């Protein structure tokens, strides 16, 4: 959500625009000692993508590329995070369910309705959303018997039907490869749907 407000012109006549952003990746942590790595997700290394592509070609593997739909919303938020919902969106929520939302609405000095909510799921744009999804995806893959590569935490392998299946990922985009197309198709339909990773 982005709220844009035009400010008055300065002494030289230049207009200034101010924006406040929620869940857009802007500074959500500004306290001393916070490191960017505390909230960032690992992603597949470029050389891993190239090397797995070389192996795929050499072994004549079948490949599937999938995008995990609603990936972040599948991940539980592990911190207490509040989000302010201003103005029109707040009004729409009250219209949707007055009994639920109206008691929690408050107004700014300028009369703008506001609603604070607790975020239970990882929300697109939240600083830690990609990291939370990474942890979930990695745990799900390990539960399926995949071993994560010790040199790249976004590459995982498992021997299926006597041949290696490789999954390489960048956030919610996965490349799955195996010599048997049925294994790749099984990975993208049955197993992924079972884990609710795709809908």
Predicted region positions:
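Long, low-complexity, charge-biased intrinsically disordered regions
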Residues: 1-199
């Amino acid at each position: 959500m982005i709220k844009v407000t035009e400010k008055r012109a300065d002494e030289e006549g230049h207009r200034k625009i101010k924006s406040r952003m929620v869940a857009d990746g802007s500074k959500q942590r500004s306290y001393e000692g916070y490191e960017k790595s505390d909230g960032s997700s690992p992603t597949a290394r470029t050389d891993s993508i190239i090397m797995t592509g070389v192996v795929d070609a050499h072994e004549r593997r079948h490949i599937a590329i999938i995008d995990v739909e609603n990936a972040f919303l599948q991940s539980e938020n592990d911190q207490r995070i509040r989000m302010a919902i201003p103005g029109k969106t707040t009004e729409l929520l009250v219209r949707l369910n007055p009994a639920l939302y109206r008691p929690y609405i408050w107004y700014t000095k300028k009369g703008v309705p506001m609603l604070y909510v607790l975020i239970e799921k990882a929300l697109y744009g939240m600083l830690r959303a990609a990291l939370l999804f990474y942890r979930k995806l990695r745990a799900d893959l390990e539960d399926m018997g995949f071993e994560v590569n010790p040199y790249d935490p976004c590459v995982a392998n498992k021997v299926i039907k006597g041949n290696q299946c490789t999954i390489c990922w960048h956030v919610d985009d996965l490349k799955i490869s195996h010599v048997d197309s049925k294994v790749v198709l099984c990975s993208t339909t049955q197993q992924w749907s079972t884990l609710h990773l795709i809908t």
